[in-house]
Amino acid sequence: MISGDSIVALSSGRLPAGVAVLRISGPQTRFVVETIAGGMVKDRVAVLRRFKAPDGTVLDSGLVIFFPGPASFTGEDVAEFHVHGGRAVVARMLEIISGFDGVRHAEPGEFTRRAFLNGKVDLVETEALADLVNAETEAQRRFAVRNAEGVQSELYLSWRRRLIHARAMIEAEIDFADEDDVPGSVSDTVWSDVRAMIGEIDRHIAGFHAAEIIREGFEVVILGAPNAGKSSLFNALARRDAAIVTDEPGTTRDLLEVTLDLGGLRVRLTDTAGLREAPGKVEAIGIEKARAKADRADLLLLLEDILAPGVLGPLPGKAPLLRVGTKLDLLDEGSAREAAGRYDVAISVVGGTGVEALLAEIGRRAADAAGDVGDVLPSRLRHVELLGEANRHLLRAAAEDAAGQELRAEELRLAADSLGRIVGAIDVEDMLDVIFSQFCIGK
């Protein structure tokens, strides 16, 4: 358990607020509670107290809860003061608490860092807590909660346990090659399991893009010729005038982005400059940005004016294409039905026709790309990198023409170490500052 300084911070949201929660963790916690709350309180019970400074000055009235270590979030003694959420109240409470000997203001993520160092959470669970705090959609929340409960960590630890067992079997075969206690078929069983694990890890790595879509968003880029109605559609989907709409071609020269929540999934929609030949110098820069953005898209919306269909030439990007006919309101009913058949979706932003159908189709494609939010997926690039590293060691170990059993066993050890670094079981000190800097002060 960590010893030394105690830390304090505001753990609740932005001030002013109805209630603010101040959290303290460390060896001085009990003394701070006794002093400010006028005596110790029962463990894990919210008690109403008048809070006073050491000189007797009344600071506020509120609830105090004490969580004795190691059965607390950080593994240390922890207390929470629930006070009125005014800026002056919180500032004075923090000033008084941090004024105690051995108590200081917490750094970003320091409470969670102490929880990790005290074995209360592993690194994957820590990252999931950061995702949960930052979750904006239902899919992000569900994904983060599942990983925070240890499902992802357990998968990596189960692979690691299998490798440790495999290595033990191989080393036993090496050490007792002349004994009858070790069956000759042990190595065959071990390498069969290792090859199966290689496939399992490969399939798991393949799910990273789905995890990216859940965490970062499904990228949708609007493309089309100038005046095809891109900015009008963008504004309609954003439900505000985010883009300038005029009859003059080439009005949009920079990328405009808005975030939507479709069926609980985050969807990032980008409006781009109209694609055309021989644009002006500034407009050409916008078109180049549009092409670069399209290269990173998950879905391209190709908009075309139904009254003036044209040929744009080769389109940027390799993402699936959704052809959208615009300005449907300018046609009579019969012509509109005929024209709509040429597109995946035909819309009229002015009348609202087809816009909800387009949103539904985008949402369906986003859901297909994200897959089942309950699937166990690698949630960080570092997971993918370490999983790939583990598999490279396993491939070398499992190769038919591999060197002696000793070297193959060493490759198994290195693979297990790579998996261990994902959850923080070994050698992760260099990653801690990066990971915990993602948290707010009070977490």
Curated annotation (Swiss-Prot):
GO terms (BP aspect): tRNA methylation; tRNA wobble uridine modification
Drop me one GO molecular function for this one: GTP binding
Q: What is its EC number?
A: 3.6.-.-
The record's listing under InterPro entries reads: G_TrmE, GTP-bd, GTP-bd_TrmE_N, GTPase_MnmE, MnmE_dom2, MnmE_helical, P-loop_NTPase, Small_GTP-bd
Task: Give the location in the cell.
Answer: Cytoplasm
Cysteines engaged in disulfide bonds, as pairs: none
Kindly list the cofactors needed.
Answer: K(+)
Uppermost EC category: hydrolase
Where is the major localization of this protein?
cytoplasm
Provide the binding site for GTP.
227-232, 246-252, 271-274
Annotated (6S)-5-formyl-5,6,7,8-tetrahydrofolate binding sites: R23, E80, K120, K443
Can you give the residue ranges of the TrmE-type G domain?
217-367
| One GO CC term on file | cytoplasm
User: Which SUPFAM superfamilies does the entry mention?
Assistant: P-loop containing nucleoside triphosphate hydrolases (SSF52540), TrmE connector domain (SSF116878)
- Superkingdom assignment: Bacteria
Q: How is its cofactor bound, per UniProt?
A: Binds 1 potassium ion per subunit.
Specify which residues bind Mg(2+) according to the UniProt entry for this protein.
S231, T252
Q: Give the PANTHER family listed for this entry.
A: TRNA MODIFICATION GTPASE GTPBP3 (PTHR42714), TRNA MODIFICATION GTPASE GTPBP3, MITOCHONDRIAL (PTHR42714:SF2)
What is the role of the protein in this entry? Answer: Exhibits a very high intrinsic GTPase hydrolysis rate. Involved in the addition of a carboxymethylaminomethyl (cmnm) group at the wobble position (U34) of certain tRNAs, forming tRNA-cmnm(5)s(2)U34.
Q: Which NCBIfam families match?
A: PRK05291.1-3, small_GTP
Subunit details: Homodimer. Heterotetramer of two MnmE and two MnmG subunits.
The record's similarity note reads: Belongs to the TRAFAC class TrmE-Era-EngA-EngB-Septin-like GTPase superfamily. TrmE GTPase family.
Q: What is this protein called?
A: tRNA modification GTPase MnmE
Taxonomic source organism: Mesorhizobium japonicum (strain LMG 29417 / CECT 9101 / MAFF 303099)
* Gene name tied to this protein: mnmE
